[in-house]
């Protein structure tokens, strides 16, 4: 058995512009090779574009997009007697928002378009309107969990 103590979760500092932890998490997810200021500019430009195009508060649209993209259940592989089962599990809130942000950034990157800020803005607006690759991924995750409901008793 491990003798290590449980490590406390570090609080995520909110970003300076919107004072939001979600925006801060998105900036960190966009960042590559430690270029945080470039990642911050991309996210802030995307949110500004969202605000201009929708005529709403950009942070509200972004939070709605993340809420829409957050999965409620996911499947985890569990080995039982030589067979591997996909066991549906409920998603905790912090993991759900992390998955939603991961999918938002991934599908923004795979999108066609000129700038990353533009692609991210389009993906955020699509997710807020319950369309786009991110929402498709959430629906696929829910379908997988529904299909494997028979193995729910293997939950751990």
Curated annotation (Swiss-Prot):
It holds the Pfam family Ribosomal_S7. Gene3D superfamilies: Ribosomal protein S7 domain (1.10.455.10). It comes from the Bacteria. One of its GO terms (molecular function) is rRNA binding. Keywords: Ribonucleoprotein, Ribosomal protein, RNA-binding, rRNA-binding, tRNA-binding. CDD domains: uS7_Chloroplast (cd14871). PROSITE patterns: RIBOSOMAL_S7. InterPro entries: Ribosomal_uS7 (IPR000235), Ribosomal_uS7_bac/org-type (IPR005717), Ribosomal_uS7_CS (IPR020606), Ribosomal_uS7_dom (IPR023798), Ribosomal_uS7_dom_sf (IPR036823). SUPFAM superfamilies: Ribosomal protein S7. Transmembrane segments: none annotated. One of its GO terms (cellular component) is small ribosomal subunit. GO terms for biological process: translation. One of the primary rRNA binding proteins, it binds directly to 16S rRNA where it nucleates assembly of the head domain of the 30S subunit. Is located at the subunit interface close to the decoding center, probably blocks exit of the E-site tRNA. NCBIfam families: rpsG_bact. PANTHER family: RIBOSOMAL PROTEIN S7 (PTHR11205). Part of the 30S ribosomal subunit. Contacts proteins S9 and S11. Belongs to the universal ribosomal protein uS7 family. This is Small ribosomal subunit protein uS7.
């Amino acid at each position: 058995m491990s003798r290590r103590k449980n490590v406390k979760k570090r609080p995520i500092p909110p970003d300076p512009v919107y004072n939001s932890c979600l925006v801060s998490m998105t900036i960190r997810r966009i960042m590559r090779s430690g270029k945080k200021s470039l990642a911050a500019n991309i996210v802030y430009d995307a949110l500004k574009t969202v605000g201009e195009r929708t005529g709403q508060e950009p942070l509200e649209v972004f939070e709605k997009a993340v809420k829409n993209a957050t999965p409620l259940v996911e499947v985890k592989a569990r080995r039982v007697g030589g067979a591997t089962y996909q066991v549906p599990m409920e998603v905790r809130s912090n993991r759900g928002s992390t998955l939603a942000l991961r999918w938002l950034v991934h599908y923004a990157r795979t999108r066609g378009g000129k700038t990353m800020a533009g692609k991210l803005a389009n993906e955020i607006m699509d997710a807020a309107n319950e369309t786009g690759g991110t929402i498709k991924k959430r629906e696929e995750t829910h379908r997988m969990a529904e299909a494997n409901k028979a193995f729910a008793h293997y939950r751990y």
